[in-house]
């Protein structure tokens, strides 16, 4: 099974991914974690470029897609074939929300390019950890920000709006209230996962 965690920066998605990893391991499942951009030697080099160098929005999108294509072929596809649970800290919907929505490159264009980059491999479940932008900004105040995190509140509002728009059209895209405490948020995720595992 392939599960992706999405959210604006500061949403707590990475914390929830770690909690799910521990939970699945305790249930005897084989688990592998990946992050985007990154997760391969090439992907980590691309990550450095994306987070630290200025570039135009088309270059940004294509670099994310290159990292994703490599990650699918090197890690995600082989892991799924071996029966692992693959947990991704961001995947294709990040490009739809950030580059398609907030950068105005267009949702349809990014969706088509995602199909090409992933060779049609997409998550079985997506958990979007949703929090208001102002809460995300407060949470990120303590942290050193990368290039994309420095974009500001208007940019993040566009990202969040695009994610919520995606949720309306996909049955496997679950919006989780990230404003609650960590344990409560995880209980919502666990309930959905348990339903999937018990079928």
Swiss-Prot record:
GO terms classed as biological process? dTDP biosynthetic process; dTTP biosynthetic process; dUDP biosynthetic process
A GO molecular-function descriptor: ATP binding
**Pfam families for this protein:** Thymidylate_kin
Keyword set, alphabetical order? ATP-binding, Kinase, Nucleotide biosynthesis, Nucleotide-binding, Transferase
Provide GO CC annotations from the record: cytosol
Q: Does the keyword Phosphoprotein apply?
A: no
| Catalytic activity, EC | 2.7.4.9
The answer on whether this UniProt entry bears the keyword Endoplasmic reticulum reads: no
Query: Where ATP is bound, by residue?
Result: 7-14
Q: Which family does it belong to?
A: Belongs to the thymidylate kinase family.
Q: What does this protein do?
A: Phosphorylation of dTMP to form dTDP in both de novo and salvage pathways of dTTP synthesis.
Supply the HAMAP family for this chain: Thymidylate_kinase (MF_00165)
What protein does this entry describe?
Answer: Thymidylate kinase
Q: What is the name of the gene encoding this protein?
A: tmk
């Amino acid at each position: 099974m392939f599960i992706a965690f999405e959210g604006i920066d500061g949403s707590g998605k990475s914390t929830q991914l770690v909690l799910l990893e521990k939970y699945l391991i305790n249930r005897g499942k084989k688990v592998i974690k990946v992050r985007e951009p990154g997760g391969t030697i090439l992907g980590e080099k691309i990550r450095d470029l994306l987070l630290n160098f200025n570039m135009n929005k088309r270059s940004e999108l294509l670099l994310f897609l290159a990292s994703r294509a490599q990650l699918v072929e090197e890690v995600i596809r082989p892991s799924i074939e071996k029966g692992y649970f693959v947990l991704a800290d961001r995947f294709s919907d990040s490009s739809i929300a950030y580059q398609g929505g907030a950068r105005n490159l267009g949702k349809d264009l990014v969706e088509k390019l995602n199909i090409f980059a992933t060779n049609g491999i997409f998550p079985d479940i997506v958990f979007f950890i949703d929090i208001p932008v102002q809460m995300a900004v407060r949470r990120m105040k303590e942290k050193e920000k990368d290039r994309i995190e420095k974009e500001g509140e208007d940019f993040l509002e566009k990202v969040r709006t695009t994610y919520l728009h995606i949720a309306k059209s996909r049955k496997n895209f679950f919006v989780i209230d990230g404003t609650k405490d960590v344990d409560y948020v995880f209980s919502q995720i666990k309930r959905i996962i348990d339903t999937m595992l018990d079928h």
